[in-house]
Structures are given as C-alpha cells and as structure tokens.
A protein has these predicted regions:
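ATP-dependent helicase/translocase motor core
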Residues: 1-43, 50-62, 83, 104-111, ...
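Conserved Walker A/P-loop ATP-binding site and its immediately adjacent core
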Residues: 60-86, 92-100, 139-141
C-alpha cells in the first residue's frame, strides 16, 4: 500500500454565499440604512460565521469588533475569517486572562494557537491604525475594549458583531 495520498492535502476553495446567506446579507444591509443596530437569527449549521464576514465586506466596514462567548469560538471564527475573507485586514485578539498565551505550570502557549493581548494601550493603538482591522474579543474581556475607547482619540467601531448574544442578554 502507498502512503502518498496521505501527504497530498487538498486546498479548499473559499466559500461563497448560499441563497439564504445572500438574503441575510441584503436584509442586514437594508436594515442598517435606517437603523444603527439589528439582530440576525440563523439556525445552527447555516453559516453564520461566514455570513457575518460577508456582511462586513458588503458594508465595507473598516474597524470591526467581534464579540464571542469563548476562546475556542474566538479561535475558530478568527481562523475562518482570516482564511475566507476577500479583503485584507489586521487582527487583534483580546483576552483579559493574562495567563493565556503565556507558559505557566498549567498552560503552554501552544494551547492558544494565536497571540492575544490584555493591554488597553495596545488595543487603543490598534483601533487607531488607518488600516482595515478586526478585534476578536471574548465577552468576558469586553471591558478592555471599553477602557481603550475612553480615550477620545480612539474611533468608534464601524460594525460590532455579538455572536451568541442571546446567551448574555436578559429579557425585558
């Protein structure tokens, strides 16, 4: 038997929006012309991660905040956006747990396969850069974003995506 096939990785084509995703993108674009916020609800497995990326691109948003409930979802979303994006953007990952990404008795930097920051000044500098940029941040670390934006010279985000927001919002 031959092992040659084991080492021939197929390069996946970048995904393209399905009909339901195109409809969602157009609906969000339309609503955001008259409203400053909205809610997109899609069933599990229907491509929310890519749909939000394509919304960012359709809106030509330059400074984006993506809030996520866990580091594992942050990692997955960041990787998928970086791979599937049709436009270049810089990435900053924010995590308030200062031990993440550092070698400790209980953790190795390889446990978190991407660099993170918990430094408010670094976050503020990143937001001020004149390039397209995305900050991926856990909900638990969002206070660091708020602190960075206390500086009046730090611009607002063009678009904020709060993934799984229903898990952290109360009912009125």
């Amino acid at each position: 038997s031959s092992y040659a096939g084991l080492f021939q990785a197929k390069v996946k084509d970048k995904p393209r929006p399905d009909t339901h995703q195109v409809e969602a993108i157009e609906a969000v674009k339309s609503k955001l012309q008259s409203l400053d916020r909205g809610q997109m609800i899609m069933a599990c497995g229907t491509g929310k991660t890519f749909t939000t990326l394509w919304i960012k691109e359709a809106l030509n948003a330059q400074t984006i905040l993506v809030l996520l409930p866990s580091l594992s979802l942050l990692s997955q979303t960041m990787r998928e956006w970086a791979w599937a994006g049709n436009t270049d953007f810089d990435i900053l990952n924010v995590c308030s747990d200062k031990s993440v990404g550092k070698k400790t008795e209980d953790m190795d930097p390889s446990d978190t396969p991407f660099p993170v920051t918990s430094e408010v000044d670094e976050i503020a500098r990143f937001i001020k850069t004149p390039k397209p940029k995305v900050i991926f941040c856990t909900y638990q670390s969002s206070q660091l974003i708020a602190e960075a934006q206390l500086d009046a010279s730090v611009p607002a985000f063009d678009l904020t995506i709060a993934d799984e927001a229903h898990r952290c919002a109360g009912k009125a």
